[in-house]
């Protein structure tokens, strides 16, 4: 299981926030994928 992305903070550059949400989406896709 991948590590949960760490929120960069409210003062972070927009690029960091975009990257965080991108990583978070990938993370959630892996974590919430059904395991058969």
Swiss-Prot record:
Matches recorded under Pfam families: Hormone_3
Sites of Phenylalanine amide modification: 36
Main localization, broad class: secreted
GO molecular function, one term: hormone activity
Record carries keyword Secreted: yes
Gene3D superfamilies: 6.10.250.900
Annotated Gene Ontology cellular component terms: extracellular region
Keywords: Amidation, Hormone, Secreted
UniProt xrefs under PROSITE patterns: PANCREATIC_HORMONE_1, PANCREATIC_HORMONE_2
CDD domains: PAH
Locations listed in the record: Secreted
Family indicated by similarity: Belongs to the NPY family.
Function recorded in the entry: Hormone secreted by pancreatic cells that acts as a regulator of pancreatic and gastrointestinal functions.
Listed name of the protein: Pancreatic polypeptide
């Amino acid at each position: 299981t991948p590590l949960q992305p760490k929120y960069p903070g409210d003062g972070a550059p927009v690029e960091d926030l975009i990257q965080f949400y991108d990583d978070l989406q990938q993370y959630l896709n892996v974590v919430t994928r059904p395991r058969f």
